[in-house]
Amino acid sequence: FLFSDILPHVLNAGVPTSAVIHEDRSLNTKEQAVGGVRMAIKNSWKRLVLVASHEHQYRAYLTFLREVLDKKSDIILYNSPAENLGWFSDSGWGVRFERLEQEFIRIQKYSQLGHLATYGEAIDYQKWKELQ
């Protein structure tokens, strides 16, 4: 999905334009996580909202969480899957339902490389987050 397609929904939800940052320099999710968490720490932000398609959201979350944990940051991550995306039509990146299998493969691959937080770390983080 394109940022230009999502932005009106974000603004209609009440998020001010000044609070929206479109990161478009990274080549992959890991680079987005490293850059995003670095930017958050530099600017003393306490919260990051991750907007991604449903099928990519879980891996994106685990990737950003890995970076938050590695930096020993107290940043709170929020998931916000993009809405109203069809599962069976080509969105420009392919058919989402067909891409789902690749996400599972990538989760396994990047977990083995240490790019993702573990399931246990995600659960512990979620417990901590709910106490904040």
Model regions and ranges:
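A structural signal for short, hydrophobic/glycine-enriched beta-strand patches
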Residues: F1-V95
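A structured, mid-to-C-terminal "fold-capping" secondary-structure block
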Residues: S89-Q132
